[in-house]
A protein has these predicted regions:
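Structural preference for solvent-exposed beta-strand-turn elements
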Residues: 1-420
Length: 420
C-alpha cells in the first residue's frame, strides 16, 4: 500500500500459498459500542467479555466515563461498567473526542438528546468531513438543538431536551445508526417512541435494549416493513455480556480463504445475526463453500464457526435492497467479484460515498490500478471478473486512511502476480 497523508510506511501484500488452520476475529464493533452505552445507563454493575478494544470503541468508553459512568478493564481483559441509570448522565467537562468513530458520534448524540446537558463533539480530519444531518434532523424534532460546522459536520455542539418529545418517525434511508440514535433518545423520553423501518437494518440495538429490560416491541408487516416501539423513561438492568466475533472483520479472512487456491480455514465464534449476513449469503450465491458449524446463541445473538474452502466464484448482481445487510463488507466483496467468472453489478450503494472515504471511488481507482476492469457508477460499480486468474497487481493503492480499503486490497494482494 502506498503512503497517504500521515500513514506510516507503505506495506506490500504478495501472492500466498494455500491458507489453512483456525483463527478468531475481534469482538463485534456494533455490539461493543452498545454494550458500553447501555451498561452505562443501567442501574448497577455490568460485565462485558470480548469487547473490541479498537480506537472507535475506546472513544465510546471514554465518553461514558466523562459523563459519570465507571468504566474499567481488569487484568483478564474483562470490562466492568457501573451505570448511572437512564437520565443520570452528567455534563461532560470537556469536548467528547470521537476520533474516527461515526458510530460513537451518532449514537451518543441520540443518547444525549433527551438529557438536560450540553456536549461538544470533535473528531479527526476524516470524521469531520462526514455529514451528521440525517441524525440531527430527527433528534431536533425531539427537542434537541445543534450548532454544527458548515455542512452539518463536526465540531458540533448539542443541547439535549428534558423532557424530550416522543417521536413517530419513518426512516427515509436505511440506517441502523439513525434508528439507534432515535431509540437511545427515546429511553429518557416520556411516552412512546415509534420508528417505521421500510428496509431492515442491523438490529443489535433492538435485541440489546430488550435484553437490558427496555419495553420494546417489533412488528413486521407483510411487505417486510418493521414497526419498532419503545416505551420511554425505562429502567435498565445490568447484564453479563459476551461479545461475539465481528462478521465485518471475519469478511477479510473469509474472502481470502475463498480466493487463495487450496485454502481451508475455520473462523471461530462469528456473530451470525441475519441483519449482518449479507456477505456470507452473497458469497454462497457466487459459489463460495462456506459452512456454519456449531451454531449456538450467546446473549441473544446467533453465533457459529465458519469453515471456508477455496472455491471458483461466478459474477453476481445482488438486489440493491440487500445493501444494508453488508454495507461495510462491499469493498472486500468487490475484490471477490474481481476474481469471479463474469460480470458483477453492484447498485444502491450511495451510502458508501460518505463512509471513512468515498468507498466506491476509492475501490474503483484501486482495482483499476491492479489490472481490474471496472466501471464506476453514481450508486455502485460494475466489475469484470478474471475468472479466477491472478490479478496483475503492482499498482500503488491510496487507502484514504480507510481501514476497510486497506484490508480489502491486502486480500487482493494474496491473489496477485506482482503484489499490492
Amino acid at each position: 500500500m502506498t503512503q497517504h497523508d500521515d500513514q506510516p510506511a507503505p506495506m506490500t501484500f504478495t501472492a500466498a500459498p494455500a491458507l489453512s488452520g483456525g483463527i478468531t476475529v475481534p469482538g463485534d464493533k456494533s455490539i461493543s459500542h452498545r454494550s458500553l452505552m447501555l451498561s452505562a445507563l443501567a442501574v448497577g454493575a455490568s460485565r462485558v467479555e470480548g469487547l473490541l478494544e479498537g480506537e472507535d470503541v475506546l472513544a465510546t468508553a471514554a465518553a461514558m466515563r466523562a459523563m459519570g459512568a465507571e468504566v474499567r478493564r481488569d487484568a483478564e481483559g474483562v470490562w466492568h461498567i457501573h451505570g448511572v441509570g437512564v437520565g443520570g448522565l452528567l455534563q461532560p467537562r470537556t469536548a467528547l473526542d470521537m476520533g474516527n468513530s461515526g458510530t460513537s458520534t451518532r449514537l451518543l448524540m441520540g443518547l444525549l438528546a433527551s438529557h438536560d446537558l450540553t456536549a461538544t463533539f470533535v473528531g479527526d480530519a476524516s470524521l469531520s468531513k462526514r455529514p451528521m444531518a440525517r441524525v440531527t434532523e430527527p433528534l431536533s424534532q425531539m427537542g434537541a438543538s445543534f450548532s454544527a460546522s458548515p455542512g452539518d459536520r463536526l465540531p458540533l455542539t448539542m443541547k439535549g431536551a428534558c423532557p424530550a418529545v416522543p417521536l413517530d418517525y419513518r426512516l427515509p434511508v436505511a440506517s441502523a445508526q439513525v434508528k439507534s440514535a432515535i431509540l437511545l433518545a427515546g429511553l429518557n423520553t416520556p411516552g412512546i417512541t415509534r420508528i417505521v423501518e421500510p428496509i431492515a437494518t442491523r438490529d443489535h440495538s433492538e435485541r440489546m435494549l430488550k435484553g437490558f429490560g427496555a419495553d420494546l416491541a417489533v412488528e413486521v408487516e407483510g411487505d417486510g416493513t418493521r414497526i419498532i416501539t419503545l416505551a420511554g423513561e425505562a429502567e435498565l438492568r445490568p447484564q453479563q455480556i459476551v461479545v461475539p466475533g465481528d462478521p465485518s472483520s471475519a469478511a477479510f479472512p473469509v474472502v481470502a480463504a475463498l480466493l487463495v487456491p487450496g485454502s481451508k480455514v475455520t473462523i471461530a465464534n462469528v456473530g451470525l445475526n441475519a441483519t449482518r449476513a449479507g456477505l456470507i449469503d452473497l458469497l454462497r450465491e457466487m459459489g463460495g463453500a462456506i459452512e456454519v458449524v456449531n451454531p449456538r446463541e450467546v446473549g441473544g445473538e446467533p453465533v457459529g464457526d465458519l469453515v471456508v474452502t477455496a472455491s471458483a466464484l461466478t459474477g453476481v448482481t445482488p438486489d440493491p435492497v440487500r445493501a444494508p445487510s453488508m454495507i461495510d463488507e462491499y469493498p472486500v466483496a468487490f475484490v471477490a467479484a474481481a476474481l469471479a467468472e463474469g460480470r458483477s453489478v453492484f447498485r444502491g450503494l450511495e451510502e458508501l460515498r460518505v463512509k471513512e472515504s468515498d468507498r466506491i471511488a476509492t475501490m474503483a481507482q484501486g482495482l483499476r490500478a491492479i489490472g481490474v476492469q471496472v466501471e464506476e457508477l453514481e450508486d455502485g460499480i460494475i466489475i469484470e471478473g478474471s475468472g479466477g486468474a491472478p490479478l496483475a497487481g503492482g499498482g500503488p493503492i491510496a487507502t484514504r486512511l480507510d481501514h476497510r480499503i486497506a484490508m480489502s486490497f491486502a486480500v487482493a494482494g494474496l491473489v496477485s502476480k506482482n503484489g499490492v
